[in-house]
Amino acid sequence: MKKNITYIFIFVFSAILFSCNDDFLEKAPLDELTDANFWESELQVKNAANGCYWTLIGKDMMINISEGLSDNALWYTLSGWRQVGSGLYGSDFSTLDGRYKDAYKQLRRCNYFLANYKRAEGIVDSKKLEQYAGEVRFLRVFIYYYLTCFWGDVPFITEPLPPGDERLFDARTPRSEIVDFMLEELDAAAKTLPRYIEPATTSFGRISGAAAKAMESRVALQNERWTVAKAACEALMPGGEYAYHELYTTGRPNQDYFDLFTFEGRASRKAGNKEAILSYVYNFDLPSPTRHNLSRELQVPDQIIRFNATKSMVDSYLCTDGLPIEKSKLYKGDGTYTPAYSAYDSVFVNRDPRLKQSFVYPGYDKWYGKVDGRGTANAAEDASKTNVFRSPKFNNDGKGAVTYTGYYIRKYCEPSKVPLYNQDDNDIIFIRYGEVLLNYAEAMFNLNSLDQDVIDKTINKLRDRVGMKKMILTELQSNGLDLKTELQRERRVELFMEGHRWYDLMRWKQGYELGVDKSETPERQEKGLMKGIRKDYAYDPAVFTATTKFDDKGFLIFDDSRVFSSPKNYLFSLPYRQMELNPNLKPNNPGWE
C-alpha cells in the first residue's frame, strides 16, 4: 500500500530536538540541543518543519477535544474534555493545564523554526524554503486560534525565548491583537504555499495556500470579522485565486456523504476526493504505524461506546419536506406503535438523508457492535443477519456495544476497523470545502447579504449532494422559520463530529445549549439537559433501573449535572499553575477571579 505523507510524523530527529516535559516557563532552550550544522540541507529543513506538524494532533484535537466539549455527543465518562464542556471544573483542572502547556511547547517549536530557517538560504531553493516557513506560520496560527478561543487574551510570543527572559512573564495580549496577527499571517503564508495539494499524492497532508485561506475564513468567522471571512471564502470558491476544491460526490446521494469519512472516500488515497483541504493522515501499514481508535470507539463491541449522541443532535435533522420535526407532518417519531419499540425505527423515517449517513439505524447491515438491544432475538429471527442492527443496547453485559442515550454514530466509522483495537488509520479532516461554504453563508448573513443566490451556492450545494430538499427563503418565511436558526441548524448537521459545535455555540452566545444556565428562561434551561431516546423505544424497557431519569414525555435524561454560567463559561479559567508561575497573567477571566 502506498506510503504517503504520514512519514512527516515519523522521524527521530525532531523528537529529540523538540521533546520536553517541563512547564512552559521552565523548559530548556531548544537551540542548545541543536547541532550547529543542522540547517544545511533541504531534508533537514523539511524535518524541522515536519516536527511542527505535531501541533495538529489529529483525532485528539478535532474529535476528543473539540467534539468532546460539545452537546452533540458526550464522552462515556464525566472526565477530561466532557467535564470541561459540562462546566464542572476549577482552575486547577489538569486537562486544561496540560493543553495550555502543550500549546506553548508547540509554539516554541514553530518560533524556533521561523527564527532559524533562513540559515539555509543559498543552500535550499528560496521558494521551497519559504514554502516550509509558510507551513509553520500556518501551524503557529492554528495554535493561537485554539488558545484564544479557549482563554481569550493569552501571552503572545513569536520568537524562541531563553529561560528566565523577562518577556516570558509579560501580561496577556488582547485577543483582538492576536486575531489581527493570525489573519495577516495566514494571508502572507498563503502566498508562499502551493495553491492546492492534490488528493492521493505523497504531498497530501501538507499545508497549501487553500488551507491557509480556509483557516483564515475560520479565524475571521469565529472572531466576527465578517468581511475578511467573506473574502477568504470567495478566494476558494469558483473564480477565486485558490479555487480547486469541490464537494465530494459520485452521484450516490444515499452514500457519498458517509463515504467522505470512510476508507471509500479518504483523500489521502482516493484521487476523486477534492473536498478535503487539509487532513491529518494516518497509515497503519508503515513500519512505525500511525493510528487512532475512532471506529472502534463508536461501536466498541463489548463495552460502552465512547461517544453517546444526544437527542438534541438527532432532533436537529429536518424532515424530507424541509421542516423541523416539531412542524412537519412527515415526522413519525412522536407516535405510539405496536410493538412499542418499533417507534425507534420511526425516528429515522422521512428525515434528511444525512441522518442515516451519520447514525446507525434499524436495518443497518454493517453493524459490528455484536449483540444489540434485542439480544439473541437477532439470531432467532434470521441467523444470517448477525451484522444487522435493530435496537439499542443498554445492558452492559460485555456481549455488545452499549449506548447511554440510545443512539450510535455511524459517521467516521470504518466498519472494517471496529473489531480491531487501535488500528484505525482513516484520515481525520481538519478543513474541507463544505465548511468553507457554510462559513461563507454565515458571513453573508451577518453582512445582510444572504439572498437566494448565495443559499443556492452554499447550503443547497450541500443538500444536493444527499438529495435533500433545497432551502428556499420564501418557504422559510411562509412556514414561520427563522433564517438564522436554520443556518445554524445546517451547520450543526453538516459538520457533526468534525469538531465545530462548541466554537459555534461560543460565537453565537448559546452556551445554554451546553448546560443549565439558571439565568435563562425555563425553555432554555431545559436545553441544558442531555437526553436520549424515549423509554418505550427500547426493546425491553426493563433494562432501565429505578434510578434512571426521564422527563415528563418519557425521554431519557442521560446527564442533568451540566451547568453553564454567562459570561463565565464563555472562556476557560487560566490554569492555576500557570498563574503561579507568572502572576502577570492575572486577573483570571470573568467569573473565574
Residue ranges and their predicted role:
Residues 1-30:
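Bacterial Sec-dependent N-terminal signal peptides
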Residues 20-21, 90, 103-106, 181-183, ...:
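Long, intrinsically disordered, low-complexity segments
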Residues 21-79, 209-216, 220-388, 515-530, ...:
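An aromatic- and glycine-enriched ligand-binding surface/loop that stacks and positions planar moieties
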Residues 41-58, 79-151, 167-180, 186-199, ...:
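Conserved, well-structured interaction surfaces
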Residues 133, 140, 209, 216, ...:
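Structural register within alpha-helical repeat arrays
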Residues 179, 226, 450-452:
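TPR-repeat structural position
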Residues 345-460:
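C-terminal substrate/ligand-recognition segments
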